[in-house]
C-alpha cells in the first residue's frame, strides 16, 4: 500500500520524493494537479538561515535545491558584511520553470499523482489505514499531511471573504474538521501576499537596480559544479512614501486584520503593509523589492507590500510609490487564514501524537516559508516510509543542523506565530554554515536512507584529506591548521604556502579553513552539546503522570504532560521547565530506580 502524501506544495513534494527513495510506493494527493509545486508567495528560494536549510535539504537528497538551481533568475549572497557563518544564499526563481522542475522530480521518483479532496483519515485512533476522498478509499501503510494554507483556508481582501487555500483553489475544510474530530488541537494562523504587477507598466528608471552576485553558486551540489544556463533578470528597489502610508491608514475601515475578521496571528518578520503602518507610525517610508516572477518578465512581485486591504485602497497605495504610479495589477493582494497543529500534536520525528503511522509536515506544523516547509516535508516523508517498511523513524539533532533546530523549537518550545528560521535561533551557528552542509548532514542521510551519493561521499573524503594536509604541512614552525586560525588567513593564502592544497577543490579548502578559524567556538559548542547529550540519555518514558510529582512546579507538570518529552534533554529545552524542575525530575527518577 505504501505512503500517501496529502498536499502538493513544497512540503508535500519533498515528503513524496523522500518516501519514494525508501519504499518506492508513494501516492501524492492534491486538489489541483496543475498547480503542484507553485510558489504561492515570493518568487525566491533561500536567504539568511533559509539558504543554509536548502543546502541541508540538498545534502539529504531534497528536490527543492535541484529545482531552485534550475529555475534561477538571479543569485545573491546575503549578510556578506558579517562572518561567513551567517551568510545566506538566495535565488530569484522563474516560477513556471520551478513548477515544471518540481513535477519532474515527482515523475523521476515514480510518485503517483492523484487529483482529489481528502475528506478524512481511515482507521482506528492509534493507526491510520488510508485516507478517504470523494472518490473512495486510498489505502496506505503511512500517511503524511502537508496541506499548507489549504487546511481550513479562508481568504480575505477588504470586505471580500471566501473559502480557499489560495486564490483560484479550494480549501481542505473537511480535513480540518476531521482532525478536530480526532481530537487534534487545531489553531489558526494568518499570512498574506502582495498584488502581482504587469512589468511593462512600471517606470524602472525611477527605481534603483539591485545588483546580483552572478551565477555559479549551487544549492544542490558543490558550488563550482553548477553552471546557470538560463536568462538573468534584474530586481529593483523602491520606497513607499508618506502618501502610501496615508492611503493605507484611510483604508483601514475595511481591513479584515483590524476590524476583527481575522483571528489568526500573522508572521512577525513578514507583516502586512497595513500592520507596518500601525506598528511603526514614525516610519514614513518602507523599502520595496520589485522582483521578477519569470524569464519572460511579464509579472513582478512587490515584496514588502503584502496586504489584505480593498482593491481600491491597493490601487491608491500603488499610485504613490515611485516607479509603480502607472502599474497595472494582474492580481490584487490578499490574506489567508488557515489551520495548524499546536505543540504536543507531533514529536521530533514529526509523527502524530498517539498515531503510529501518521506524520505532519510544513505549515500545518506552525512554520512560515517554503524552505522550512520543504525541510519538514523531507523528514516526515522519509520517516513515514521507514515506518511503512517496519523501520524506526529518525530525528535530526539540534547541534548538527538547522533542521534539528527547527524541529526542536517546534516540539520543545512551540510557537505563537508562524515560525521562521533565523541563524540566531541556533547556539551552534558558527558550525551550522551553508558551506559545510554536505559533511554535517551525512550522518542523518545515512540514518534515513542508508547511503551517501557519490558527490557527497567525495566531498567528505576531500575535506578529511584537506584537514590531514593542514595538520601535517608546516610554515614558520606552525602547522597550516594553526595558521588558519589567524584573522587574516584565507584559502588562497594557504594554497600559496602549500602547493599540495592547490589540488583541493576550493569550496572544500574554504570549509576546512573556516572550521579551523571557528574551532574554539565550535569546541565550546560541542562541550555544551555533550552535556545535552548526557541529559538525552536520561529517559522519561517510565513517567506516567507528571501531576503526581510534587518536586516540580504545577506549570512544569502541565507542560510535561502535554508535550511528553522522551528524555531529560528534551524537557530541559521546554520554556516552562526550570532548572529546579530538572533537579526534581532527577530526584524522582533516582528514587524510583533505587526502590
At which residue positions do the language-model features occur?
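Beta1/beta-strand and adjacent pyrophosphate-binding region of the FAD-binding site
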Residues: 1-11
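Conserved beta-strand-loop-beta-strand element in the redox core of flavoprotein oxidoreductases
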Residues: 122-137
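Short hydrophobic core segments
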Residues: 6, 138-148
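Conserved N-terminal/central alpha/beta ligand/cofactor-binding core
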Residues: 17-120, 146-166, 170, 174-176, ...
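A glycine-rich dinucleotide-binding beta-alpha-beta segment and adjacent secondary-structure elements
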Residues: 289, 301-367, 394-408, 505-559, ...
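Extended, charge-enriched "interface" segments that sit outside catalytic cores
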Residues: 425, 431-433, 437-438, 442-595
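Internal hydrophobic alpha-helix adjacent to the cofactor/substrate pocket in enzyme cavities
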Residues: 373-394
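An anion/pyrophosphate-binding glycine-rich loop and adjacent beta-alpha core
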Residues: 32-34, 177-315, 412-480, 485-487
Amino acid at each position: 500500500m505504501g505512503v500517501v502524501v496529502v498536499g502538493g506544495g513544497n512540503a508535500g513534494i519533498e515528503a513524496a520524493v523522500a518516501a519514494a527513495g525508501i519504499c518506492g510506493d508513494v501516492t501524492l494527493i492534491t486538489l489541483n494537479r496543475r498547480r503542484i509545486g507553485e510558489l504561492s508567495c515570493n518568487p525566491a528560494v533561500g536567504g539568511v538561515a533559509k539558504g543554509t536549510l536548502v543546502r541541508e535539504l540538498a545534502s539529504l537528497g531534497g528536490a527543492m535545491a535541484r529545482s531552485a538551481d534550475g529555475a534561477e533568475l538571479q543569485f545573491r549572497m546575503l549578510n556578506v558584511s558579517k562572518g561567513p557563518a551567517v551568510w545566506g544564499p538566495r535565488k530569484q526563481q522563474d516560477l513556471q520553470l520551478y513548477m515544471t522542475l518540481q513535477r519532474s522530480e515527482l515523475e523521476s521518483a515514480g510518485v503517483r499523482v492523484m487529483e482529489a479532496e481528502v475528506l478524512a483519515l481511515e482507521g482506528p485512533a492509534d493507526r491510520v489505514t488510508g485516507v478517504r476522498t470523494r472518490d473512495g478509499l486510498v489505502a496506505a501503510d503511512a500517511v503524511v499531511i502537508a496541506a499548507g494554507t489549504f487546511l481550513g483556508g479562508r481568504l480575505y481582501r477588504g470586505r471580500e471573504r471566501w473559502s480557499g487555500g489560495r486564490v483560484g483553489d479550494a480549501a481542505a475544510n473537511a480535513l480540518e474538521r476531521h482532525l478536530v474530530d480526532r481530537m487534534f488541537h487545531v489553531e489558526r494562523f494568518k499570512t498574506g501576499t502582495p498584488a502581482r504587477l504587469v512589468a511593462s507598466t512600471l517606470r524602472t528608471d525611477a527605481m534603483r537596480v539591485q545588483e546580483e552576485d552572478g551565477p555559479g553558486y549551487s544549492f544542490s551540489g558543490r558550488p563550482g559544479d553548477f553552471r546557470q544556463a538560463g536568462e538573468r533578470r534584474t530586481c529593483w528597489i523602491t520606497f513607499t512614501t508618506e502618501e502610501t502610508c496615508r492611503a493605507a491608514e484611510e483604508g483601514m475601515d475595511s481591513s479584515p486584520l483590524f476590524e476583527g475578521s481575522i483571528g489568526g496571528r500573522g508572521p512577525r518578520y513578514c507583516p502586512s503593509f497595513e500592520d507596518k503602518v500601525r506598528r511603526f507610525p514614525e516610519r514614513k517610508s518602507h523599502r520595496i523589492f520589485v522582483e521578477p516572477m519569470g524569464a519572460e518578465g511579464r509579472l513582478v512581485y512587490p515584496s514588502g507590500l503584502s496586504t489584505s486591504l480593498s482593491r481600491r485602497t491597493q490601487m491608491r497605495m500603488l499610485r504613490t510609490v515611485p516607479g509603480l504610479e502607472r502599474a497595472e495589477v494582474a492580481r490584487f493582494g490578499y490574506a489567508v487564514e488557515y489551520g495548524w497543529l499546536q505543540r504536543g500534536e507531533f514529536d521530533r520525528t514529526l509523527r502524530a501524537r498517539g498515531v503510529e503511522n501518521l506524520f505532519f509536515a510544513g505549515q500545518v506544523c506552525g512554520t512560515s516559508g517554503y524552505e522550512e516547509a520543504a525541510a519538514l516535508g523531507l523528514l516526515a516523508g522519509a520517516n513515514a516510509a521507514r515506518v511503512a517498511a517496519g523501520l524506526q523513524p529518525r530525528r535530526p539533532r539540534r547541534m548538527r543542523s538547522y533542521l534539528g533546530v527547527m524541529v526542536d523549537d517546534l516540539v520543545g518550545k512551540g510557537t505563537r506565530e508562524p515560525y521562521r528560521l533565523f541563524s540566531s535561533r541556533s547556539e551552534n551557528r558558527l558550525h551550522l554554515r551553508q558551506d559545510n552542509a554536505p559533511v554535517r548532514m551525512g550522518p542523518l542521510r545515512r540514518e534515513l536512507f542508508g547511503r551517501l551519493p557519490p558527490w557527497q561521499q567525495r566531498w567528505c573524503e576531500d575535506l578529511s584529506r584537506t584537514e590531514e594536509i593542514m595538520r601535517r604541512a608546516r610554515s614558520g614552525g606552525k602547522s597550516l591548521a594553526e595558521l588558519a586560525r589567524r584573522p587574516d588567513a584565507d584559502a588562497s593564502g594557504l594554497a600559496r604556502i602549500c602547493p599540495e592544497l592547490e589540488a583541493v577543490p576550493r569550496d572544500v579548502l574554504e570549509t576546512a579553513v573556516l572550521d579551523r578559524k571557528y574551532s574554539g567556538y565550535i569546541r565550546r559548542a560541542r562541550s555544551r552539546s555533550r552535556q545535552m547529550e548526557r541529559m538525552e540519555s536520561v529517559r522519561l518514558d517510565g513517567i506516567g503522570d507528571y501531576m503526581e510529582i510534587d518536586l516540580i512546579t504545577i506549570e512544569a507538570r502541565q507542560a510535561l504532560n502535554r508535550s511528553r518529552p522522551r528524555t531529560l534533554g528534551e524537557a530541559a529545552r521546554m520554556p516552562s521547565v526550570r532548572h529546579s524542575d530538572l533537579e526534581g525530575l532527577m530526584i524522582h527518577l533516582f528514587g524510583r530506580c533505587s526502590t
